[in-house]
């Protein structure tokens, strides 16, 4: 078996569906969405045709801000710019779910699609504060 680096869970499921991978690691919620063709997989007819092998671990989601930030809670993200992960990624879906759970939508939070590396660079440079 050959190991390949990918963009994450959503990419892994798309690569698996396209038969570019034989085994993939993915977030459980995205596996379910791909199978049900909901969430970020709602418009993707080729997202099925796989089975689960094993559950690996419970995933922790982290919200990161600069040490000098006045943000102390998710509610403090109102009116801020937030990196929610790469477009159509598991990170984007989870970020939107978290913000929604706190009553925040794209009219209340400016959501930016950046991958981890770009979001970290922007955060470090102080261009905007939070990364979800």
Segments predicted by a language model, with ranges:
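Bilobed "Venus flytrap"/periplasmic-binding protein-like clamshell domains
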Residues: 1-2, 55, 59-125
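Pocket-flanking alpha-helical
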Residues: 4-43, 119-122
């Amino acid at each position: 078996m050959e190991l390949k680096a990918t963009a994450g869970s959503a990419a892994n499921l798309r690569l698996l569906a396209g038969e570019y991978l034989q085994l993939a690691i993915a977030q459980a919620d995205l596996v379910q969405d791909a199978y049900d063709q909901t969430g970020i997989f709602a418009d993707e007819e080729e997202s099925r045709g796989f089975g689960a092998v094993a559950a690996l671990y419970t995933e922790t989601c982290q919200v990161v801000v600069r040490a000098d930030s006045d943000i102390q809670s998710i509610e403090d993200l109102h009116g801020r710019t937030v990196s929610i992960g790469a477009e159509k990624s598991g990170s984007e879906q989870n970020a939107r779910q978290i913000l929604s759970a706190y009553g925040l939508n794209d009219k209340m939070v400016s959501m930016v699609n950046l991958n981890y590396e770009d979001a970290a660079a922007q955060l470090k440079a102080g261009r905007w504060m939070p990364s979800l």
